[in-house]
C-alpha cells in the first residue's frame, strides 16, 4: 500500500474516505506485544478552517484532561468549554462559511519494554483506534499517520516509520465535529507490534448444520522471513486434545 505523507482537506468531502488505513480484519487473541493507550488524554475544542486546524493539530499545546474511551459530550468540563466558545463566537457575529468546529486530542506515552524491544528489532508497529465518531486525522511524533472518515469499526495504521528514536512519544488527533451524533474516542486505543511473519486475518466458515467447516488465514511476511514455516492446529474445547494440525512453508497452502 502506497503511504500518503501529507493530510488533505479534500478527504472531508468523501464520507467513505480512508487514507493509510490497514485492511479491516477479524479479531482474535494474540501473544503479540500490545500496549494500551487509553486512560487519561488531553483535549481542547478548536475552530477555524479545516486547513488551519490540520496545520495546528501537531503543534497544539493548550489542553485539559479527558478520558479515553469516552464521549466528549459526557465530559462536563469539555461541555462547559464548548458552550463558552459557542457564546464567544456568537458575540463576534456570523461565522465564515468555511469555519468548522473540531477537537484536538493528545496523548504522550513511553513504550513498554516488550513493544520497545520489538520496535528496535524492526517489527511492524500498528496504532489502532477501536472506535470514534467524526472524521479523524492522526499524527505520531509530529508525523502524519492517516485519516479515516468514521470509526465505528476499528481503524489501524502502520506507524513503524513514524515512531521516532525518543523516550517519550506523542499521538495527536484532530477529530472533526459530527453533526449527526456525539463524538470522541469511544473505544480503546492501542499500539501493537507485529513480527516479520504474522497472521493479518482469520476467516472461518462453517456449514449450516455444523458438520463441516474451513479456515482461511491471511499471512504477511517480509523478505527476511519468507523461509518461515506456518503451523495451524485445531484443539478440542479444553484446548488439550489436538484434533487436526498441518504445517507448510510461508506462501503455500496447508
Spans of features found by a protein language model:
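Aromatic sugar-binding surface patches on proteins
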Residues: 153-156, 250-254
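N-terminal helix-cap/turn-to-beta initiation motif at the start of protein domains
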Residues: 29-38
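Accessory beta-strand-rich segments of carbohydrate-active enzymes
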Residues: 1-28, 42-48, 95, 99-201, ...
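Beta-strand-rich binding/interaction modules
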Residues: 138-140, 213-250
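Short, solvent-exposed loop/linker segments at the N-terminal edge
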Residues: 206-213
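Glycan-recognition and processing domains
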Residues: 69-71, 78-81, 179-183
Amino acid at each position: 500500500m502506497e503511504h500518503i505523507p501529507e493530510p488533505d482537506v479534500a478527504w472531508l468531502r468523501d464520507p467513505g474516505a480512508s487514507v493509510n488505513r490497514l485492511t479491516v480484519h477479524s479479531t482474535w487473541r494474540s501473544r503479540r506485544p500490545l500496549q494500551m493507550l487509553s486512560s487519561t488524554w488531553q483535549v481542547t475544542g478548536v475552530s477555524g478552517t479545516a486547513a488551519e486546524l490540520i496545520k495546528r493539530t501537531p503543534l497544539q499545546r493548550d489542553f485539559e484532561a479527558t478520558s479515553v474511551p469516552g464521549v466528549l459530550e459526557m465530559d462536563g468540563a469539555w461541555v462547559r468549554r464548548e458552550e463558552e466558545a459557542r457564546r464567544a463566537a456568537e458575540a463576534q457575529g456570523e461565522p465564515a462559511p468555511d469555519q468548522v468546529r473540531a477537537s484536538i486530542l493528545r496523548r504522550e506515552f513511553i513504550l513498554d519494554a516488550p513493544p520497545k524491544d520489538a520496535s528496535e528489532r524492526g517489527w511492524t508497529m500498528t496504532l489502532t483506534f477501536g472506535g470514534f465518531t467524526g472524521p479523524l486525522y492522526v499524527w505520531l511524533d509530529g508525523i502524519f499517520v492517516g485519516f479515516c472518515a468514521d470509526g465505528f469499526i476499528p481503524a489501524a495504521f502502520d506507524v513503524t516509520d513514524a515512531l521516532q528514536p525518543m523516550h517519550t512519544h506523542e499521538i495527536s488527533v484532530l477529530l472533526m465535529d459530527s453533526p449527526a451524533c456525539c463524538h470522541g474516542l469511544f473505544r480503546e486505543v492501542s499500539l501493537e507490534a507485529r513480527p516479520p511473519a504474522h497472521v493479518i486475518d482469520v476467516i472461518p466458515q462453517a456449514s449450516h448444520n455444523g458438520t463441516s467447516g474451513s479456515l482461511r488465514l491471511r499471512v504477511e511476511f517480509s523478505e527476511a522471513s519468507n523461509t518461515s514455516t506456518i503451523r495451524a492446529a485445531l484443539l478440542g474445547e479444553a484446548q488439550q486434545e489436538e484434533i487436526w494440525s498441518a504445517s507448510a512453508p510461508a506462501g503455500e497452502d496447508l
